[in-house]
Amino acid sequence: MNQMVDMSHAVPTARGLREARAFAPASVANVAVGFDLLGYPLDGVGDTVTVRRIDAPVVRIAAIRGTTVALPLEAERNTAGAALMSLRAALALPFGFELEIDKGIALSSGMGGSAASCVAALVAANALLDTPISTDQLYQHALDGEAVASGSRHGDNLGPLFLGGLVLCTLERLVPIAVPEAWHSLVVHPEAVLETRRAREALAGDYRLSEFVAQSTNLALVLAGCHAGDADLVRAGLRDVLVEPRRAPLIAGFAQAKQAALAHAALGASISGAGPSVFAWFETRAAAAAAAPAVQAAFAGVGLDSQAWVTPINSPAARLLA
């Protein structure tokens, strides 16, 4: 969607800025063992948001372009718009924001598209404030924005976009998790759509205590392995016994794709976010790149084209653009 944008009402900040633009990458959330807790950025693909400071005390979306345009222009129904509405209300700002969203992340891909728009909007808007606020404060407004898309406040796609790298995300704080620089992630996105709300509905039902114990054990192994740089610990723990068994049937070719990654020495593989994308961890970039064709072939075997990305787990956070 293309629309003419009226710049006549853009208000300069105390630092002279009328407009700011920010990029936020895609992300992998849950990471098999940390449902709604763990995530990391996926460098190389993401959303760009341009924000203008305007006289009118409102938030409005002027345009949405790119890979996904079937998104609400109403600010309160859009994660980026809702996040800026939360920011305005909390700071009692006398001015408003106008934004344009350029989407680079496919809708309902399990790659954090709603979070990317949300964080990019906040990073850009923060640059337009007379007194920018802290990352912790921005994170709280991002949680408000993300709730529009998923129906609940959770930060596993948001935290990594503020800090970069693997991040443990509670509702109150963000904790960076050290990961060896050499470790890389492979993410493969099959050209299929799995709505986040439908994926969450699949999780309804009873869970056994033994499942929670096993999942807690796996989370501890992964965190300890990352901290120590011990690939064997991560390999022992990077498996999902709670969520994956309930969501995997919704993703055609998932079992074959996961097996292909493990056959190429992945430390582990599972569903990225709500799916249908799949992620896998490897000790080197070369190993991740070598596995990509096999994982894509698994999806091709069920009639799905796909895209693949190989990036460091320690990929960078969202950033302002010149």
Curated annotation (Swiss-Prot):
Keyword Phosphoprotein: no
GO biological process, one term: threonine biosynthetic process
UniProt binding sites for ATP: 106-116
Classification via InterPro entries: GHMP_kinase_C_dom, GHMP_kinase_C_sf, GHMP_kinase_N_dom, Homoserine_kinase, Ribosomal_Su5_D2-typ_SF, Ribsml_uS5_D2-typ_fold_subgr
Keywords attached to this entry: Amino-acid biosynthesis, ATP-binding, Cytoplasm, Kinase, Nucleotide-binding, Threonine biosynthesis, Transferase
This protein's pathway: Amino-acid biosynthesis; L-threonine biosynthesis; L-threonine from L-aspartate: step 4/5
Domain of life (superkingdom): Bacteria
Protein name: Homoserine kinase
Species of provenance: Xanthomonas campestris pv. campestris (strain ATCC 33913 / DSM 3586 / NCPPB 528 / LMG 568 / P 25)
PANTHER family found in the cross-reference section: HOMOSERINE KINASE, HOMOSERINE/4-DIPHOSPHOCYTIDYL-2-C-METHYL-D-ERYTHRITOL KINASE
Subcellular location: Cytoplasm
One function term, GO molecular function aspect: ATP binding
